[in-house]
């Protein structure tokens, strides 16, 4: 007999003003991963993604908000970070390290891609989805 296992997704939504005081938010977002062997790596990647959303997406405007959804599944923890900006162009979403060490942009995306198991962008480019496998926890 074939049984279908239904495992509900659990998610939490966070809405916060654009600010660079992100340490408490990062800590809260990482609560389900507090025993992860790669916690420092995830913390670094989330911090970078949030700073990019505040600085570049929302232009540092404290009147704009970030929307973050944390999704827990049996095998993954997923963070979706959305800003109010016009989005990152497809051509700028590289996971490669910039050729020039003094390049003004691109290092953050390289770092983010190396901190998470899966990185995806919305079509518009103003929502970034980051995922970490739970078996690494």
PLM region descriptions:
Residues 69-71, 82, 122, 131:
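Solvent-exposed beta-strand sheet faces enriched in polar/charged residues
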Residues 101-116:
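Glycine-rich phosphate-binding loop
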Residues 65-75:
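Short beta-strand/loop element within the Bergerat-fold HATPase_c
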Residues 78-105:
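Glycine-rich/acidic phosphate-handling loop/turn and adjacent ATP-lid/helix
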Residues 1-44:
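Bergerat-fold GHKL ATPase/HATPase_c domain
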Residues 1-17, 113-137:
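Flexible, glycine-/charge-rich segments associated with ATP-binding catalytic modules
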Residues 74-78, 125-127:
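A generic structural signal for beta-strand entry/edge sites
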Residues 37-62:
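Conserved ATP-binding N-box helix of the HATPase_c
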């Amino acid at each position: 007999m074939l049984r279908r296992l239904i495992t509900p997704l659990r998610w939490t939504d966070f809405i916060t003003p654009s600010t660079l005081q992100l340490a408490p938010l990062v800590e809260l977002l990482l609560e389900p991963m507090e025993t992860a062997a790669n916690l420092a790596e995830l913390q670094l990647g989330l911090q970078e993604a949030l700073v990019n959303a505040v600085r570049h997406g929302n232009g540092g405007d404290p009147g704009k908000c970030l929307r973050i959804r944390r999704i827990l599944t049996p095998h993954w923890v997923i963070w979706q970070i959305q800003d109010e900006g016009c989005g990152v162009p497809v051509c700028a979403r590289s996971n490669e390290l910039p050729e020039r060490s003094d390049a003004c942009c691109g290092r953050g995306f390289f770092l983010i891609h190396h901190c998470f198991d899966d990185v995806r962008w919305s079509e518009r480019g103003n929502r970034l989805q980051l995922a970490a496998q739970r078996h690494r926890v």
